[in-house]
């Protein structure tokens, strides 16, 4: 579960390394984001010469979450870290590579570009 003020790792090569959630999309009363949900993030650490800089605000999608999530077949999926992929205004990834595995729930939420770039889909 991702909520406001949650620190996350960036799983792409957009230039950001660490970000913080500042808003969860999906209504005024929505508190938590899970796998495949969009959030608004603020960049807290970035590499020099990257596409995004520190203090930038951008949209992101959650690709890995520590809190386990139940699937329709009854199994659970969870990861060791909270990770996001940064998105542009059209909803496509800002980076050209994805690092680490991503959840299969992204395919259900129509993030095909992220699924195709990922080295592993769990």
UniProtKB/Swiss-Prot annotation:
Gene3D superfamilies referenced in this protein's UniProt entry, alphabetically: Ribosomal protein L14 (2.40.150.20)
SUPFAM superfamilies: Ribosomal protein L14
UniProt keyword Magnesium, yes or no: no
GO molecular function, one term: large ribosomal subunit rRNA binding
Top-rank taxon, per record: Bacteria
InterPro entries reported in the protein's UniProt record: Ribosomal_uL14 (IPR000218), Ribosomal_uL14_bac-type (IPR005745), Ribosomal_uL14_CS (IPR019972), Ribosomal_uL14_sf (IPR036853)
Record bears the keyword Ribosomal protein: yes
GO BP, sorted A to Z: translation
HAMAP family in the cross-refs: Ribosomal_uL14 (MF_01367)
Family under the similarity heading: Belongs to the universal ribosomal protein uL14 family.
PANTHER family associated with the record: 50S/60S RIBOSOMAL PROTEIN L14/L23, LARGE RIBOSOMAL SUBUNIT PROTEIN UL14M
Its biological purpose: Binds to 23S rRNA. Forms part of two intersubunit bridges in the 70S ribosome.
Protein name: Large ribosomal subunit protein uL14
Record organism: Chlorobaculum tepidum (strain ATCC 49652 / DSM 12025 / NBRC 103806 / TLS) (Chlorobium tepidum)
Gene this protein is translated from: rplN
């Amino acid at each position: 579960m991702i909520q406001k003020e949650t620190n996350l790792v960036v799983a792409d090569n957009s230039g950001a390394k660490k970000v913080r959630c500042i808003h969860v999309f999906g209504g005024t009363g929505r508190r938590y984001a899970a796998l495949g949900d969009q959030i608004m993030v603020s960049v807290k650490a970035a590499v020099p010469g990257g596409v995004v800089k520190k203090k930038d605000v951008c949209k992101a999608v959650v690709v890995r979450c520590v809190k386990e999530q139940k699937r329709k077949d009854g199994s659970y999926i969870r990861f060791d870290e909270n990770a996001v992929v940064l998105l542009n205004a059209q909803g496509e990834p800002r980076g050209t590579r994805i690092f680490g595995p991503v959840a299969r729930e992204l395919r259900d939420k129509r993030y095909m570009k992220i699924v195709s770039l990922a080295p592993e889909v769990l």
